[in-house]
Design a protein with these regions (language model features):
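Short, well-ordered coil/turn segments that N-cap beta-strands
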Residues: 1-2, 23-25, 182-186, 242-246, ...
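N-terminal capping/small domains of soluble enzymes
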Residues: 1-183
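Conserved, mostly hydrophobic/aromatic
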Residues: 4, 188, 248, 286, ...
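Glycine-rich beta-to-alpha transition loops that act as phosphate-gripper elements at the mouths
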Residues: 6-10, 252-254, 293-306
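Catalytic cores of alpha/beta
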Residues: 13-19, 175, 301-316
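Glycine-rich phosphate-binding active-site loops on the catalytic face of alpha/beta enzymes
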Residues: 25-37, 190-192, 308-316
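Extended, H/D-rich, highly charged conserved domains that either
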Residues: 166, 170-183, 187-200, 221-225
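Glycine/Thr-rich beta-alpha phosphate-binding loop at enzyme active sites
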Residues: 196-292
């Protein structure tokens, strides 16, 4: 199973549908948070994405309000159920929608994001779900019984997205809340800074990315390996006690300095193929630490040329 990680490419229903037709079956839909819409858009300098080679982006990149995002995901969910059956593209139950929420526990427990989570877990009472069933029945009357039986449970899993510098205690509180209070299979997104400055610098230099500039402050402020391992052990035990799955999303983007006017501002976040060597090193360390038993959702420079090798390594 593979598909788009949370980002602008998994924000609109038509993009999710296009990804499905291209073979994607796992969709980590765009992250939602309490600050949204125009309020969030005003905080993002433009342009906010550059992908000439390795990828760079500014923090955040959405103009949708949380209810609008929810509607996009419900539309995509219902459309894929019908399209998969009508066009014989695979099992109507053969794909997964994974929520992504951030960026602190207060915001996640607030009315806006809490309602989103509840509605994604059960969309049956939402106006959008009811409208989708009505429209699809009109378009495909021969499938009315199938359409009426479409599950309103759009998502049963979530990825925790936190800002760089988020304290480990806050990360654990968020994940624990989602496991215990929401009953969701939960993945925690990790930052490449967990590798340490020296390792990250050595890896990127050896791969020809010596021109990418960063200092040590994010490495000092972000989650440390010594704090991460026992926290992940506790969260795994908690998930096991609830009959749920726990895992790690590898990896978040990598904060670097803006030195060549790539994007506005002094700092940006790296992704794409230059992130791959850092993320695969994270996978290796975590897999060794947890004897290959830690679930990993990989999203750090995965592409056509390395997907087969990732699967062969047992990352899927």
């Amino acid at each position: 199973p593979f598909g788009p990680a949370a980002g602008p490419n998994s924000q609109l229903a038509q993009n999710i549908i296009a990804a499905y037709f291209a073979g994607a079956r796992f969709f980590e839909v765009k992250t939602v948070q309490k600050m949204d819409g125009e309020e969030l858009a005003r905080c993002v300098p433009r342009p906010c994405i550059l992908a000439a080679d390795e990828g760079y982006n500014q923090e955040w990149s959405t103009e949708l309000e949380v209810p609008q995002a929810q509607n996009e995901y419900i539309k995509a969910w219902c459309a894929l159920k019908v399209l998969s059956k009508v066009y014989g593209l695979g099992s109507p139950d053969g794909f997964v929608f994974n929520m992504s929420v951030g960026y602190d526990l207060e915001g996640i427990k607030g009315e806006k994001v809490n309602s989103y989570i509840d509605n994604m877990m059960d969309a049956s009472n939402t106006a959008q779900f009811k409208e989708c069933l009505a429209v699809l029945t009109e378009l495909f009357p021969e499938e009315k019984d199938f359409i009426a039986a479409i599950s309103p449970r759009v998502s049963r899993s979530v990825t925790v997205s936190t800002l760089h510098g988020c304290p480990p205690q806050e990360i654990e509180r968020i994940a624990s809340y989602l496991l215990t209070e929401k009953g969701l299979h939960t993945f925690v997104k990790c930052n490449p800074t967990i590798l340490g400055y020296k390792t990250a610098r050595t890896i990127l230099d050896s791969m020809g990315y010596d021109y990418i500039v960063f200092d040590e402050h994010h490495f000092n402020e972000d989650l440390q390996w010594a704090d991460a391992v026992p926290m992940f052990e506790r969260l795994q035990a908690l998930a096991d006690s609830k009959g749920l799955e726990f895992g790690l999303k590898l990896s978040n983007t990598f904060p670097v300095d803006t030195t060549r006017n790539e994007l506005p501002g002094t700092e940006m976040y790296m992704s794409g193929r230059s992130l791959f060597p850092l993320t695969i090193e994270m996978c290796s360390r975590i897999s060794r630490q947890f004897n290959g038993k830690m679930r990993i959702s990989f999203a750090g420079g995965a592409e056509f040329f390395n997907c087969d090798k990732l699967f062969a390594a047992g990352i899927w």
